[in-house]
Curated annotation (Swiss-Prot):
Function of the protein: Catalyzes the decarboxylation of four acetate groups of uroporphyrinogen-III to yield coproporphyrinogen-III.
This protein's name: Uroporphyrinogen decarboxylase
UniProt record similarity statement: Belongs to the uroporphyrinogen decarboxylase family.
PROSITE patterns hit by this protein: UROD_1, UROD_2
UniProt site positions, description: Transition state stabilizer: D73
Pathway entry: Porphyrin-containing compound metabolism; protoporphyrin-IX biosynthesis; coproporphyrinogen-III from 5-aminolevulinate: step 4/4
Top-rank lineage group of the source organism: Bacteria
Pfam families: URO-D
Oligomeric form and interacting partners: Homodimer.
One annotated Gene Ontology cellular component of this protein: cytosol
HAMAP family reported in the protein's UniProt record: URO_D
Gene Ontology terms, MF aspect: uroporphyrinogen decarboxylase activity
Gene: hemE
Cellular localisation: Cytoplasm
Length: 348
């Protein structure tokens, strides 16, 4: 793209107004999404490129957001490695043959994601055609640790005790698992960039369950390796921006700086200016309104949004977002007004 507020902010370049997009900006809060969801299962939507492309475009048509993010899911990458994934009503994702031993790790396949998740790669191509340069497109993947946690726990977990048990008791198997996942994530993100993604985000949804020392020892080296591999393998100079986002990592921002991501996503558990000070001046930041704020009256949404923008103080390198994904109960009109307000307030 020749010009984009979002891409400029990722590179800490001056912009005329703060760019804004939202995690889960395509989702259940939108009536257009619900109309499709009534006819198709979740994985069916993810795995049908035409449906995924249409869902990706819905918030671009509805709101003045500065970027699209491909409609996809982080877990189908594990299917290609030999894990059986379903989405159960009321339970969320379930992996029916979880990884619990060194033998399970050794049995994992390492295929080419261009083949195993070809539907997402094709959806990216379709969205790039439909966008016609109106906005950049963000691709994404789960981080190696978060994918490992799902694979080991067999789904979501409150304490990730099975993951930690394998990590502590079988360090060699843990390293092998993380190496395989890092290779898969890197290849997947490179394929997304080759298909047209203008930036990519790495979601480390469960890394906040770890102590800082465990994050530094068992997770950080693989995030670093992944980012290095994507930059080296994408074939673009300069490489597209890489965003790293995790939930519950406000106490580890000094470590996150060491990932060497271009942008660090902040959740809502820290003031934006404090978080930015911890990640350092050489990194852009993304965030960080509590997504549940969007359930409040508009005056409160506006007040809290203005506070975040004031803390950014017009400094190059801020991308406005939520501290997590939009919740299903969010009023559509609040999202519309929020995107407009971010632009208007930051341009003053």
């Amino acid at each position: 793209m020749t010009h984009s507020r979002f891409l400029a902010a990722c590179r800490r370049q001056p912009v005329d107004a703060t760019p804004v997009w939202f995690m889960r900006q395509a989702g259940r809060y939108m009536p257009e999404y619900r109309a499709i969801r009534e006819r198709y299962g979740f994985l069916e939507m993810v795995k049908t490129p035409e449906l995924a492309a249409e869902i990706t475009m819905q918030p671009i048509r509805a709101f003045s957001v500065d970027a699209a993010i491909i409609f996809a899911d982080i877990l189908p990458l594990l299917e290609g490695m030999g894990l059986h994934l379903t989405y159960e009503q009321g339970e969320g994702p379930v992996i029916h043959n979880p990884v619990r031993s060194p033998a399970d790790v050794a049995a994992l396949r390492t295929p080419d994601p261009r083949e195993t998740v070809a539907y997402t790669i094709q959806a990216i191509r379709l969205v790039k055609r439909d966008l016609e340069g109106r906005a950049p497109l963000i691709g994404f993947s789960g981080a190696p640790f978060t994918l490992a946690a799902y694979a080991i726990e067999g789904g979501s977990s409150r304490d990730h005790r099975l993951t930690k048990a394998l990590m502590y008791a079988e360090p060699q198997a843990w390293r092998e698992l993380m190496e395989r996942l890092t290779a898969q994530v890197s290849a997947y993100l490179i394929a997304q960039i080759e298909a047209g993604a203008d930036a990519v985000q790495i979601f480390d949804s469960w890394a906040g369950a770890l102590a800082p020392g465990d994050y530094a020892d068992y997770v950080l080296p693989f995030v670093q390796k992944c980012i290095i591999a994507v930059r080296a393998g994408c074939g673009i100079v300069p490489p597209p921006p890489i965003i790293y986002f995790g939930v519950g990592l406000s106490g580890m921002l000094g470590l996150l700086r060491q990932t060497d991501a271009d942008v660090i996503g902040l959740d809502w558990r820290i003031h934006l200016d404090d978080g930015w000070a911890q990640v350092g001046p050489g990194v852009a930041v993304q965030g960080n309104l509590d997504p549940h704020t969007l359930l409040a009256p508009w005056t409160e949404v506006r007040r809290r949004t203005a506070d975040i923008l004031d803390r950014a103080a017009g400094r190059p390198g801020h991308i406005f977002n939520l501290g997590h994904g939009i919740v299903p109960e969010t009023p559509v009109d609040t999202v519309r007004r929020l995107a407009e307000f971010v632009h208007e307030y930051s341009a003053e």
